[in-house]
């Protein structure tokens, strides 16, 4: 038995997402978040989004085949899947918390708005413009290529999973995007074009499928939020080079 499906869940809206949107709208340089990135919790809306996600997972019968759960160590991702499983009345499957699934590290640019990056770190902004989003690594942080490298390592473990047909990954928008890029073998231009026209919404569901071990992965669904009919849909992503948002 081999993993045939990967279901990717982005965490619900976080309090840092809310603070970042507020800081951007106010034209501020810095985002006021009293947590380190790993400890950022969900917002009240994020909790509601997670409950709606849980009902969707139950409706889709996520546990109708053997399931394994991989989770980012960051609080917002863990809260999302815990709330979702409880809301859907689902039993927690075999779980692994894996640091390779953490969000992208922004280094000196963390908690800066886009304006703040330009005002306080103009050299980093010039480097980003020159290198491009895929290769730019802010001081003390990671490039998209760095995130992709650690996710290649994690995905190499997929074929070593025993007794599992469906892998559920609860993590972050950068992780969802990079897992899709690795599975579909997207190069830099293809990934940048895909990211330009597609955003990973909060509490969204993305699905990849293959026929058997070694077969190519197919993207069956990307950032589905149909289950958020009664909740606000939020993106809070780096789609417009707004790289600060958690």
Q: Which positions does each model-derived feature cover?
A:
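Acidic, low-complexity terminal tails and accessory targeting/binding regions
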Residues: 1-6, 90-92, 104-116, 181-246
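Generic beta-sheet signal
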Residues: 6, 67, 165-171
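Short, active-site-adjacent cap segments at secondary-structure transitions
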Residues: 15, 76-78, 103-104, 175-177
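Active-site-proximal alpha-helix that buttresses catalytic centers in soluble enzyme cores
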Residues: 2-9, 15-92, 120
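Short, well-ordered beta-to-alpha junction loops that form the rim of enzyme active sites
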Residues: 11-12, 71-75, 100, 169-174, ...
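Short glycine/proline- and acidic residue-enriched helix-loop micro-motifs
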Residues: 33-41, 125-145
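Internal catalytic-core helix/loop-beta-alpha segment
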Residues: 137-160
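Glycine-rich phosphate-binding loop signature in dinucleotide/nucleotide-binding domains
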Residues: 60-65, 158-165
